[in-house]
Every structure is written in C-alpha cells, then in structure tokens.
Amino acid sequence: RAGLKFPVGRVHRLLR
C-alpha cells in the first residue's frame, strides 16, 4: 500500500 508515498490515484489503480 504505497498510497502515502505515491500519488494516490495512479498507484491506487495498479495496486487495486
């Protein structure tokens, strides 16, 4: 869960 370090929205889609 790298939402705090990465821009929540780009990584959120990849992690999800």
UniProtKB/Swiss-Prot annotation:
Organism the protein comes from: Euphlyctis cyanophlyctis (Skittering frog)
Location of the protein in the cell: Secreted
Lyase recorded as keyword: no
Family: Belongs to the histone H2A family.
GO BP of this protein: defense response to bacterium
Alphabetical list of PROSITE patterns matching this protein: HISTONE_H2A
Tissue expression per record: Expressed by the skin glands.
Descriptive protein name: Buforin-EC
GO MF entry, a single one: protein heterodimerization activity
Function: Has antibacterial activity against E.coli HP101BA (MIC=9.6 uM), K.pneumoniae PTCC1388 (MIC=10.6 uM), M.luteus PTCC1625 (MIC=6.0 uM) and S.aureus PTCC1431 (MIC=8.1 uM). Has no or very limited (<3%) hemolytic activity at concentrations of 15 ug/ml and 60 ug/ml, respectively.
Keywords recorded for this protein, A-Z: Amphibian defense peptide, Antibiotic, Antimicrobial, Secreted
GO cellular component: extracellular region
